[in-house]
């Protein structure tokens, strides 16, 4: 039997908040691995996705959006995003083609030059007509002449196959780091916490989702192969608890049901989910929470 030649490539996806990084990762992997919401700064840590295409294993890093950080948490998120560049063979800079390049976008482009990084630019959301697309293309061709440009739609999948073909062509002969059916190296308890946090983002209004985090305290496989999950929603103020619980606990029950359904779809087994709310003043200043969030 002839051993298959294995190739590997690591790819970092970086860009502004809500530019489509997580949507692209999910599209490529074929599973909803990275949470997606309309709110900015949803992704807080590096989410690793893995896809193996015949002889080539592609390891993708979805990163927090780049923005002007203020508090300790935001600074850690942005620092985490930039640090991912150093472990990647290829950098994909995703740009929202529906918006003009703003000051932060130009700062990111300048940073690539300072770091001697030649990114691949992905002009995302081309499924919607944009009056800025041609101007963005023209600017990038002048400012980064060595970089390739791929107009794509991460949401609809347009040109993602072309992008994957290019990524695959850049892979080098190297043993795979993961099994050929792995889609991530993240612990299931971490993924479960992210799923619940996504539902909190989607179901809580205004700024409250940014003031909380979720930790999986118990992840137990039962004899019938179902999973029991205990999670704690950590908030910084007592006044937030009533909002999360809702009248007679209806809000947290609804969030729990939606989270459980997504977990069952991803884990392919029944899930028993129990949610608790805990007040932990100034949790954003505690190192233990950053270690749990992997930032």
From Swiss-Prot:
Q: Name one GO molecular function term.
A: small ribosomal subunit rRNA binding
- Please report the organism this UniProt entry assigns to the protein: Rickettsia typhi (strain ATCC VR-144 / Wilmington)
The job of this chain, per UniProt, is described as:
An essential GTPase that binds both GDP and GTP, with rapid nucleotide exchange. Plays a role in 16S rRNA processing and 30S ribosomal subunit biogenesis and possibly also in cell cycle regulation and energy metabolism.
Give start-end of the signal peptide: none
| Assembly and oligomerization | Monomer.
What are the boundaries of the region G1?
15-22
Q: Where is the KH type-2 domain?
A: 204-281
Q: What is this protein called?
A: GTPase Era
Q: Which PROSITE patterns match?
A: G_ERA, KH_TYPE_2
Concerning CDD domains, the annotation shows:
Era, KH-II_Era
Return one Gene Ontology term, BP aspect: ribosomal small subunit assembly
Give positions of region: G4. Answer: 124-127
- Residue ranges for the region (G5) are 152-154
The alphabetical list of record keywords is: Cell inner membrane, Cell membrane, Cytoplasm, GTP-binding, Membrane, Nucleotide-binding, Ribosome biogenesis, RNA-binding, rRNA-binding
Q: Gene3D superfamilies from the entry?
A: 3.30.300.20, P-loop containing nucleotide triphosphate hydrolases (3.40.50.300)
* Location of the region described as G3 in the Swiss-Prot/TrEMBL record: 62-65
Q: Name one GO cellular component term.
A: plasma membrane
Provide an example Pfam family for this protein.
KH_2
Query: What domain of life is recorded for the organism?
Result: Bacteria
């Amino acid at each position: 039997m002839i051993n298959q030649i294995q190739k590997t490539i690591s790819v970092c996806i970086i860009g502004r908040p809500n530019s489509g990084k997580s949507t692209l990762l999910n599209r490529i992997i074929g599973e909803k691995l990275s949470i997606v919401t309309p709110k900015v700064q949803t992704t807080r840590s590096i989410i690793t996705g893995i896809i193996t295409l015949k002889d080539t294993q592609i390891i993708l890093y979805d990163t927090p959006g780049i923005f002007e950080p203020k508090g300790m948490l935001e600074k850690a998120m942005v620092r985490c995003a930039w640090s991912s560049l150093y472990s990647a063979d290829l950098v994909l800079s995703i740009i929202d083609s529906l918006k003009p390049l703003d000051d932060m976008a130009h700062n990111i482009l300048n940073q690539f030059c300072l770091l001697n990084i030649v990114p691949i630019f992905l002009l995302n959301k081309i499924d919607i007509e944009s009056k800025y697309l041609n101007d963005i293309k023209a600017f990038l061709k002048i400012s980064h002449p060595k970089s390739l440009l791929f107009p794509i739609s991460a949401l609809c999948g347009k040109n993602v196959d072309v992008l994957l073909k290019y990524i695959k062509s850049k892979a080098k002969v190297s043993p795979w780091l993961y099994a050929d059916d792995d889609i991530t190296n993240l612990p299931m308890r971490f993924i479960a916490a992210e799923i619940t946090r996504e539902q909190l983002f989607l179901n809580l209004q205004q700024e409250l989702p940014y003031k909380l985090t979720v930790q999986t305290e118990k992840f137990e496989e039962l004899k019938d192969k179902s999973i029991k999950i205990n999670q704690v929603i950590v908030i910084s103020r007592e006044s937030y608890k009533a909002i999360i619980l809702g009248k007679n606990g209806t809000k947290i029950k609804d969030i729990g049901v939606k989270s459980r359904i997504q977990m069952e779809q991803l884990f392919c087994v029944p899930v028993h989910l129990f949610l608790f709310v805990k007040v932990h003043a100034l949790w954003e200043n505690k190192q233990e929470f950053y270690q749990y969030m992997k930032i």
